[in-house]
Amino acid sequence: MAQPDSSSLAEVLDRVLDKGVVVDVYARLSLVGIEILTVEARVVAASVDTFLHYAEEIAKIEQAELTAGAEAAPTPEA
């Protein structure tokens, strides 16, 4: 019987750092309609190179959205 292929911890860590992982959490605790605790968290695990690559791409997307919004906005007439 063949044993299933298993990955070492180093291989798993290498893949996570290469691809990146984002955990986004929003939780609210209320008791009798009174909000007691709210937790908002975003945890990102990635290598610096991966983070910089994706940050660059996100900046391009945001810039394109701003440019498109500015072109669509009516210009005030004098």
Swiss-Prot record:
Q: Which GO terms describe its molecular function?
A: structural molecule activity
The subcellular localization recorded is: Gas vesicle shell
Which UniProt keywords are present, listed alphabetically?
Gas vesicle
Q: What cellular-component terms does GO give this entry?
A: gas vesicle shell; vesicle membrane
Q: Does the keyword Magnesium apply?
A: no
Q: What induces it?
A: Synthesizes gas vesicles at all stages of growth in media containing 15-25% NaCl, but not in 13% NaCl. This gene is highly transcribed in all salt levels tested, excpet for very low expression in stationary phase. Longer transcripts able to cover the whole locus are detected at much lower levels. The protein is expressed in both 13% and 20% NaCl (at protein level).
Top-level taxon of origin: Archaea
**Chief localization class?**
other
**A Pfam family recorded for this sequence:** Gas_vesicle
Signal sequence residues? none
Belongs to which family?
Belongs to the gas vesicle GvpA family.
UniProt function note: Gas vesicles are hollow, gas filled proteinaceous nanostructures found in some microorganisms. During planktonic growth they allow positioning of the organism at a favorable depth for light or nutrient acquisition. GvpA forms the protein shell.
Give the misc comment: In this organism gas vesicles are about 200 nm wide and 430 nm long. The organization of genes in the locus is quite different from Halobacterium and Haloferax, being gvpACNO followed on the same strand by gvpFGH; other genes have not been identifed.
- Partners and quaternary state? The gas vesicle shell is 2 nm thick and consists of a single layer of this protein. It forms helical ribs nearly perpendicular to the long axis of the vesicle.
Its protein name is Gas vesicle protein A
Species, as recorded: Halorubrum vacuolatum (Natronobacterium vacuolatum)
